[in-house]
Amino acid sequence: SGASEDVTKVVEATKIAKDLRPDLKIDGEMQFDTAFVPEVGRLKFPNSSVAGNASVFVFPDLQSGNIGYKIAQRLGNFEAIGPILQGLNKPVSDLSRGSNEEDVYKLSIITAAQALM
């Protein structure tokens, strides 16, 4: 956290998301432990309904997102599908060289669903 171009992007994206979807619980920039760990969330953002209970994590760029999802996948033994790229004119998917057949299948389903939207 702190002042940087990435933090500015997250602040701007948060404002846009809140304007477009006021019905969603959205908080702005916070460190992962604050977003994920209830005790840390209560300590750092006591008035937030999201801190410590976040279910969606938005990263400021592809590299940061890639690092985050690979850590979760490899250390946490979580199923990770992605990265899922948004905001382009057509669906685009990117697969790691370490992807297996199931990864390709699942990301293909997501890409096909994006194409139908």
What are these regions, as identified by a protein language model?
Residues 29-32, 62-63, 97-98:
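Short, ordered loop/turn segments at secondary-structure junctions
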Residues 1-8, 38-41, 68-72, 105-106:
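Short acidic, glycine/serine/threonine-rich loops at helix termini
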Residues 12, 16, 38, 68, ...:
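C-terminal functional extensions of proteins
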